[in-house]
């Protein structure tokens, strides 16, 4: 999301203003800050990756060199101002909307809302899973980041969508992708946030409908949701990580339980999540 920041700053002489989580995290490679055995689901996710994906992974030297250059440049950028929810900068108002990434913000200007990757037309942003920082990382983070639950996870992302919905219907979104696609503009309003929430509700519906009174596991659940063509090679990991985010949310709402061996079972009626989501889509409930 910030791949051209160093070039832009150099060419424009502009300052970098970013969400307050950006500066303390930017010196780390994102996939190296997570303790991979921090939960039963993430432990299972990485076991499957090690057994079924990594043995067939073919290194891409050019891509790795590009990534290395990016991380080195990012670590050296200076953040001139930390942005927090509710800050006002002239006519702009800052809204913190984590979930797709911890540092995602939206900018309100008149009756427009610049949503970045938080709300997109046509496609749905990938939600983060819950974060458990590695101990060596955690001890160097500011106090407000010690509990990352406010900034990571599907529940956090859905809450951020609900936050936008509370603004009311009179905003037009200006997203980072797909505003103009296939020779046409995709003008959309706040209703798009509701559509994305409903998309995730339908995924949760499918997962629980397939579970019923049976037990399952992460890989079985993933293969039951995604068609085979979308699970080839490294795509399996991306799909499983998205399913992990949904399972974490269902565990938080008390609709499933995760056993010590990674087995997944439905709890009660398995409908608590629907009440939670209904209140996000309609704040007046």
Predicted region positions:
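Aromatic/hydrophobic pocket-lining residues that form the small-molecule binding cavity
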Residues: 2, 157, 243
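Short amphipathic alpha-helical segments and helix-helix/interface helices
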Residues: 5-9, 161, 247
């Amino acid at each position: 999301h910030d791949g051209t920041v160093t070039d832009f700053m150099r060419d424009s002489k502009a300052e970098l203003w970013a969400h307050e989580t950006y500066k303390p995290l930017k010196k780390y490679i994102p996939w190296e800050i997570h303790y991979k055995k921090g939960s039963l689901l993430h432990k299972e996710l990485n076991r499957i990756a090690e057994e079924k994906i990594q043995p067939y992974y073919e290194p891409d030297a050019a891509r790795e060199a590009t990534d290395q250059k990016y991380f080195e440049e990012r670590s050296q950028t200076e953040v001139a101002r930390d942005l927090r929810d509710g800050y006002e900068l002239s006519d702009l108002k800052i809204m913190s909307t984590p979930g797709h990434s911890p540092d995602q913000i939206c900018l309100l200007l008149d009756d427009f809302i610049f949503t970045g990757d938080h709300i997109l037309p046509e496609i749905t942003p990938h939600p983060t899973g819950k974060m458990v920082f590695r101990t060596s990382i955690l001890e160097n983070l500011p106090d407000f980041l010690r509990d990352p639950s406010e900034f990571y996870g599907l529940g956090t992302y859905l809450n951020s969508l609900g936050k936008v919905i509370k603004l009311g219907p009179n905003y037009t979104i200006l997203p980072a992708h797909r505003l103009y696609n296939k020779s046409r503009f995709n003008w959309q309003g706040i209703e798009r946030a509701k559509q994305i929430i409903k998309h995730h509700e339908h995924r949760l519906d499918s997962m629980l409908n397939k579970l019923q009174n049976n037990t399952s596991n992460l890989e079985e659940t993933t293969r039951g949701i995604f068609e085979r063509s979308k699970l080839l090679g490294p795509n399996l990991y991306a799909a499983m990580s998205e399913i992990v985010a949904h399972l974490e949310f269902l565990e938080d709402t008390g609709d499933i339980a995760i056993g010590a061996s990674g087995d997944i079972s439905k709890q009660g009626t398995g409908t608590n999540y629907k009440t939670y989501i209904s209140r996000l889509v309609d704040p007046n409930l």
